[in-house]
Curated annotation (Swiss-Prot):
Its EC number is 2.5.1.6. Mostly expressed in stems and leaves. It is found in: Cytoplasm. L-methionine binds at residues 56, 99, 246, 277. Mg(2+) binds at residue 9. ATP binds at residues 15, 167-169, 235-238, 246, 252-253, 269, 273, 277. Disulfide bonds: none annotated. This is S-adenosylmethionine synthase 3. NCBIfam families: metK. It comes from Solanum lycopersicum. Pathway: Amino-acid biosynthesis; S-adenosyl-L-methionine biosynthesis; S-adenosyl-L-methionine from L-methionine: step 1/1.
Length: 390
């Protein structure tokens, strides 16, 4: 049997880049909660003892940016300098201006356009992907790497492993076979975890706890065998982490946010962007389209691309490829997609309820992936049943 290896990585919520994504989306949540028409393009950067938020926001909401920054960092677990950042004593810098009036008139006509008329906030192309290899219809490498990261945070916060600190990275290599275009996982080849820890714990204790409390509950036993390789904190020491260890920026983890290197990516990041930014809303709707194709039994694996021009409502192109796994021709699947999904930005906002913020709605997306999540707030994960015409 001919097989191949494929690898996906993840980082958990204490990684400095992910801290920035969460701050940007916490600010988006706060704006949309009070004013669903908020136009938000919020970037965050961080380094030792400092978090800065900057960008363009036009909103009627009253938002305490500094409080949101501190609350978000504290919620992650950055409560003292020795864990990488002290949420209550770090410097918070804010440099936020209004959205450019040139962009405003072209995209939403200074809020005068009807939903079906609202143009894309920028040019770009986005991809959605789905595969039948997991119940989530997501790649197994990505699902396992992401769940390992989430479990690391869980056992840190519930004190199962009190030596854990917020920063951490995971990576999973899976051996696959190609079944006429569909991906079939055979086994987990390698598991890599690098996690921040306190000064007191030994490397043996780290390895033992990670195997028992993180790997065992996450990776199904059927995928592990005596040949599975484990690299657990292979550098030997990871005490300094978070923004103290390295700088962080919003939008630096776009593959972790999506499909772990499978499918394709148009390059646009998600966090800190309101739904007129098609980098986000366009990527969400093509995930729904690709997932619906696979869930409806029309293909075992599917990728969908959409593209836009700034200020233009209708997409420039829509593309689908089922990697030769389709039960009907791709051209017929494309017709079904165009009939069932409205790719105009204003209509995506309505159909996926994307103008609703608050209650951590977008902040939740900013760690552990935007896709394959079982949460009603992730409206783009709802399957539309696609029926080919008789």
């Amino acid at each position: 049997m001919e097989t191949f290896l494929f690898t996906s990585e993840s980082v958990n919520e204490g990684h400095p880049d992910k801290l920035c994504d969460q701050v940007s989306d916490a600010i988006l949540d706060a704006c949309l909660e009070q004013d669903p028409e908020s136009k938000v393009a919020c970037e965050t950067c961080t380094k030792t003892n400092m978090v800065m938020v900057f960008g363009e926001i036009t909103t009627k909401a009253t938002v305490d940016y500094e409080k949101i920054v501190r609350d978000t960092c504290r919620g992650i677990g950055f409560v003292s300098a020795d864990v990488g950042l002290d949420a209550d004593n770090c410097k918070v810098l804010v440099n936020i201006e209004q959205q450019s009036p040139d962009i405003a008139q072209g995209v939403h006509g200074h809020l005068t356009k009807k939903p079906e008329e609202i143009g894309a906030g920028d040019q770009g192309h986005m991809f959605g992907y789905a595969t039948d290899e997991t119940p989530e219809l997501m790649p197994l490498t990505h699902v396992l790497a992401t769940k390992l990261g989430a479990k690391l945070t869980e056992v840190r916060k519930n004190k199962t492993c009190p030596w854990l600190r917020p920063d951490g990275k995971t990576q999973v290599t899976v051996e696959y076979k190609n079944d006429n275009g569909a991906m079939v996982p055979i086994r987990v080849h390698t598991v890599l975890i690098s996690t921040q820890h306190d000064e007191t714990v030994t490397n043996d204790q780290i390895a033992q706890d990670l195997k028992e409390h993180v790997i065992k509950p996450v990776i199904p036993a059927k995928y592990l065998d005596e040949n599975t390789i484990f690299h657990l904190n292979p550098s030997g020491r990871f005490v300094i982490g978070g923004p103290h260890g390295d700088a962080g920026l919003t939008g630096r983890k776009i593959i972790i946010d999506t499909y772990g290197g499978w499918g394709a990516h148009g390059g646009g990041a998600f966090s800190g962007k309101d739904p007129t930014k098609v980098d986000r809303s366009g990527a969400y709707i093509v995930r729904q389209a690709a997932k619906s194709v696979v869930a409806s039994g029309l293909a075992r694996r599917c990728i969908v691309q959409v593209s836009y021009a700034i200020g233009v409502a209708e997409p420039l192109s829509v593309f689908v490829d089922t990697y030769k796994t389709g039960t009907i021709p791709d051209k017929d699947i494309l017709v079904l997609i165009k009939e069932n999904f409205d790719f105009r930005p204003g209509m995506m906002s309505i159909n996926l309820d994307l103008l609703r913020g608050g209650n951590y709605r977008y902040q939740k997306t900013a760690a552990y992936g935007h896709f394959g999540r079982d949460d009603p707030d992730f409206t783009w994960e709802t399957v539309k049943v696609l029926k080919p015409k008789a």
